[in-house]
Amino acid sequence: MYIGRFLVLGKTDEGNPFVTYRVSSRSFPNRVAKVMNDETVAILPKDLEEMFKNPYITYNCVKLVGDVAVATNGSHTDIIADKIKLGLPIRDALSYSLLTMDYEKDDYNTPRIAVVITKDEAYMGYVTDSDVRIKKVELEAGKAYYLSVYEACKITEHQVISVTGKTAEEVTKFVMDYEEFEKPVTAATVLVKDGFKLATI
């Protein structure tokens, strides 16, 4: 099944919260997730000239702000992180940013999706051309929600998968190799364990 870009939010078997963002693409397969510094992971085209073909293929997909991690499928990563840095509650930062940025104005009206986690809390959110939702979710060890731009842009108990892996690297590889979701390109994970651990593939 092709669901495009998606987020996976859950806990490892050891009970450590994580979020993984995976790029799946038919149109722009030549992208990489790159750790830019201790607080940021960016999605970049391998050929930098592709940046001028589509405004939505280059963005920060992960941003760390103190004890909060933000992961999204677009430039709203920075907006959400900035609002949290200014002191907005997570729910409000998500709501404001998704409503302000709205869905992507491309040929598909691609939704914007987002996850924000701390060691104690997890929120999911999305905005489409017909809906917007923010929800605080409870996480269970070994299980994870997924939220995608195509076919699975919902926050529901019906969109849950089992996840294996103890480290950020292992979780990233698991999500990257998850065969049910087609056209993997690159992925990045934030794992909460003695602070934040970042991994990309």
UniProtKB/Swiss-Prot annotation:
Enzyme Commission number(s) from the entry: 3.5.4.10
UniProtKB keywords: Hydrolase, Purine biosynthesis
EC category name: hydrolase
Recorded GO MF terms: IMP cyclohydrolase activity
Superkingdom field: Archaea
Pathway: Purine metabolism; IMP biosynthesis via de novo pathway; IMP from 5-formamido-1-(5-phospho-D-ribosyl)imidazole-4-carboxamide: step 1/1
Reactions catalysed according to its record: IMP + H2O = 5-formamido-1-(5-phospho-D-ribosyl)imidazole-4-carboxamide
Cysteines paired by S-S bonds: none
One Pfam family recorded for the sequence: IMP_cyclohyd
GO BP terms: 'de novo' IMP biosynthetic process
Keyword rRNA-binding attached: no
SUPFAM superfamilies, sorted: Archaeal IMP cyclohydrolase PurO (SSF75569)
HAMAP family cross-referenced by the UniProt entry: IMP_cyclohydrol (MF_00705)
Entry's family note: Belongs to the archaeal IMP cyclohydrolase family.
Biological role stated in the UniProt entry: Catalyzes the cyclization of 5-formylamidoimidazole-4-carboxamide ribonucleotide to IMP.
The protein's name: IMP cyclohydrolase
Species whose genome carries this gene: Methanococcus maripaludis (strain DSM 14266 / JCM 13030 / NBRC 101832 / S2 / LL)
